[in-house]
């Protein structure tokens, strides 16, 4: 049988009599922890038995040791009481208030003093005070005497006064088994083993001819949880890689932005329900953006009022720049698209972003107050909805989702518009994973863009729900997310 050097030393030192780990370590010439480890390994192989025996005893606390040496406060006060008594006020002049306060209750409880009211003050008259049970117990513990027969009530009182505490001492006992005895009788050879190969040994060649300890790498070990990316961060990285592979460039921009970029440039009227505090988060301080590009401001004003030169009638109201300057937490990353269209107005263009958005929604299995949106848009001449749907099929197929469904819908800033649905692998339910469409001419008018722009906003969490089979978005994101689930998600390495 293959045994380590420590196992051999321990086995050779064992006999039929059970011994403590401390005595075994001394006999084997090992440190106690090394002897226990060797005995435990022998026990796993059936060559020895290892058991724990716990002994409990009461020991004095720091305060208990002080009182055992100097006397309990009630004993100190009693012994200082004059035979004809003393007032409480005079007593407090002789002893610290804390000592007097502790002693008063115990003097009364033990009957060591008689208390009388006299001239508006408390008068203490000493009584007979033989050694009490708690004093005897403190002395016995202090002197290391046997604790058998200790009175339970006295122990409870001393514990309550924090004068003693229960201390448990664990002793390990080791005994050889019949199998271990057979191995021992067959002869145990003690050969020095090396546990670690060092650079110096390699350089000098001193490792040659040495015996190295064998390690069983198949033995179970404690799981170590190191730092790792959150499942959504891994999902974001995968989406970014996929869109970059498809020829897109990434957009970046502020999470706090003016309503001008979040709503007004998207041809969303200022009285739209989605622009109220019921749906979006407004900033209290600062409340407004410092400035807006005035060339765009005037064009947006005209488009909202009468459609400008887009051929539309607009929304037929007086647009308010003050409302447009209000700062909000962006409810979609289309605010980035609104910013980038002003800088990249000549086709062809392909941009995307994957970032957080914030909506004042009711939290349920598919909605959160904060989630990650996959924003994207393509600008080119003569684009159609066919190219848009083809982009989705290509993107989602690369993300592992091949079954999609499209449904016409309405959006203030796209026409025509489509909702995208993916089928959940477990429930079979169709889940809306995004919204899309072709930007309206009213939205393109302020930029002076004559080319077609198709765009979308997709939900990363819902994509992940389909990929991983989860039915509740809160299982992926937020305080209800299971830590064991996060630890068990495979880490996918990609260059």
UniProtKB/Swiss-Prot annotation:
List, alphabetically, the SUPFAM superfamilies matched: Class II aaRS and biotin synthetases (SSF55681), Winged helix' DNA-binding domain (SSF46785)
User: Which Gene Ontology cellular-component terms appear in the entry?
Assistant: cytoplasm
Q: Which residues are recorded as binding L-phenylalanine?
A: 334, 373-375, 413, 439
Q: Does the keyword ATP-binding apply?
A: yes
Q: Which molecular-function annotation in GO is an example for this chain?
A: phenylalanine-tRNA ligase activity
Keywords in UniProt for this one? Aminoacyl-tRNA synthetase, ATP-binding, Cytoplasm, Ligase, Magnesium, Metal-binding, Nucleotide-binding, Protein biosynthesis
Q: What does the note accompanying the cofactor annotation read?
A: Binds 2 magnesium ions per tetramer.
Q: What is the annotated localization of this protein?
A: Cytoplasm
Q: Which residues hold Mg(2+)? A: 415
Q: Which major enzyme category is it?
A: ligase
Q: The organism sits in which domain of life? A: Archaea
Disulfide pairs?
none
Q: Which Pfam families match?
A: tRNA-synt_2d
The protein's required cofactor(s) are namely: Mg(2+)
Transmembrane ranges, per UniProt, are none
Question: Could you say which EC number(s) this protein's record lists?
Answer: 6.1.1.20
Predominantly, its location class is cytoplasm
One BP term from GO: phenylalanyl-tRNA aminoacylation
Record field: catalytic activity: tRNA(Phe) + L-phenylalanine + ATP = L-phenylalanyl-tRNA(Phe) + AMP + diphosphate + H(+)
The entry's family comment says: Belongs to the class-II aminoacyl-tRNA synthetase family. Phe-tRNA synthetase alpha subunit type 2 subfamily.
Summarize the subunit comment: Tetramer of two alpha and two beta subunits.
| Protein name as annotated | Phenylalanine--tRNA ligase alpha subunit
Organism whose genome encodes this protein: Methanocella arvoryzae (strain DSM 22066 / NBRC 105507 / MRE50)
């Amino acid at each position: 049988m293959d045994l380590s050097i420590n196992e051999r030393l321990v086995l050779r030192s064992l006999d039929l009599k059970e011994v403590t780990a401390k005595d075994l370590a001394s006999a084997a010439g090992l440190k106690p922890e090394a002897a226990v480890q060797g005995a435990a390994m022998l026990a796993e192989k059936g060559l020895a038995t290892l058991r724990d025996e716990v002994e409990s005893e009461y020991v004095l606390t720091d305060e208990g040791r002080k009182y055992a040496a100097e006397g309990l406060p009630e004993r100190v006060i009693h012994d200082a009481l004059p035979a004809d008594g003393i007032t409480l006020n005079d007593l407090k002049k002789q002893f610290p208030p804390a000592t007097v306060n502790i002693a008063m209750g115990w003097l009364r409880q033990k009957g060591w003093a008689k208390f009388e009211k006299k001239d508006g003050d408390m008068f203490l008259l000493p009584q007979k005070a033989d050694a009490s049970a708690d004093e005897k117990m403190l002395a016995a513990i202090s002197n290391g005497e046997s604790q058998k027969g200790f009175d339970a009530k006295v122990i409870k009182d001393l514990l309550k006064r924090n004068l003693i505490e229960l201390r448990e001492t664990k002793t390990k006992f080791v005994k050889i088994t019949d199998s271990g005895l057979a191995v021992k009788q067959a002869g145990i050879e003690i050969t020095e083993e090396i546990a670690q190969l060092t650079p110096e040994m390699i350089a000098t060649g001193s490792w040659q001819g040495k015996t190295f300890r064998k390690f069983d790498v198949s033995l179970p070990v404690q799981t170590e949880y190191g730092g790792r990316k959150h499942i959504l961060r891994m999902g974001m990285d995968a989406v970014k890689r996929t869109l970059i592979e498809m020829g897109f460039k990434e957009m970046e921009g502020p999470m706090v932005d003016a309503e001008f970029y979040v709503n007004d440039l998207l041809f969303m009227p200022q009285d739209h329900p989605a622009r109220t505090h019921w749906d979006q988060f407004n900033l209290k301080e600062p409340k407004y953006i410092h400035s807006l590009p005035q060339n765009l401001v005037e064009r947006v004003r005209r488009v909202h009022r009468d459609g400008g030169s887009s051929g539309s009638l607009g929304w037929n109201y007086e647009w308010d720049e003050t409302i447009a300057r209000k700062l909000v937490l962006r409810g979609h990353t289309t605010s980035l698209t609104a910013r980038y269209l002003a800088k990249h107005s000549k086709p062809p263009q392909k941009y995307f972003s994957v970032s957080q958005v914030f909506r004042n929604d009711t939290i349920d299995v598919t909605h959160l107050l904060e989630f990650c949106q996959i924003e994207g848009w393509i600008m080119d001449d003569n684009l159609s909805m066919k190219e848009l749907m083809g982009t989705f099929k290509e993107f989602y197929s690369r993300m592992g989702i091949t079954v999609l469904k499209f449904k016409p819908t309405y959006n203030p800033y796209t026409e025509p518009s489509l909702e995208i649905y993916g089928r959940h692998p477990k429930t079979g339910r169709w889940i809306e994973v995004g919204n899309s469409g072709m930007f309206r001419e009213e939205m393109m008018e302020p930029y002076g863009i004559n080319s077609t722009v198709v765009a979308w906003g997709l939900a990363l969490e819902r994509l992940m729900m389909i990929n991983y089979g989860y039915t509740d978005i809160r299982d992926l994101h937020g305080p209800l997310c299971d830590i064991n689930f996060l630890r068990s998600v495979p880490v996918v390495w990609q260059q």
